[in-house]
């Protein structure tokens, strides 16, 4: 039982969250994202592509300040539980004020 608990704790410790931020303009941005979209990938997203039209969300490309993609702890946990079959990823779009 101790070995199983130790293996589970070790697996949770070595998994991590990932976040990529792309700053488009150096303008004042809203604190909260204009829109948060969850993309549903399968088999770690191999051969899959999802896009977000940030210009459409912000009402024009000149209003886009930054975009982020993030694999949260919960997303990583879902991927771990399903052995990588289901691997969600969140995308956020920030617009100028």
Curated annotation (Swiss-Prot):
Lipid-conjugated positions (N-palmitoyl cysteine): 17
Keyword Signal annotated: yes
Membrane association type: Lipid-anchor
Lipidation (S-diacylglycerol cysteine): 17
Biological process annotations from GO: cellular response to magnesium ion
Signal peptide: 1-16
Subcellular location: Cell membrane
Coarse class of the protein's main subcellular location: membrane
Pfam families: Lambda_Bor
GO CC annotations on file: plasma membrane
Ranges in coiled-coil conformation: none
Entry keywords, A to Z: Cell membrane, Lipoprotein, Membrane, Palmitate, Signal
Family of the protein in this entry: Belongs to the lambda phage bor family.
Additional note from the record: Encoded by the cryptic lambdoid prophage DLP12.
UniProt-recorded name of the protein: Prophage lipoprotein Bor homolog
Organism in which the protein naturally occurs: Escherichia coli (strain K12)
Gene that encodes it: borD
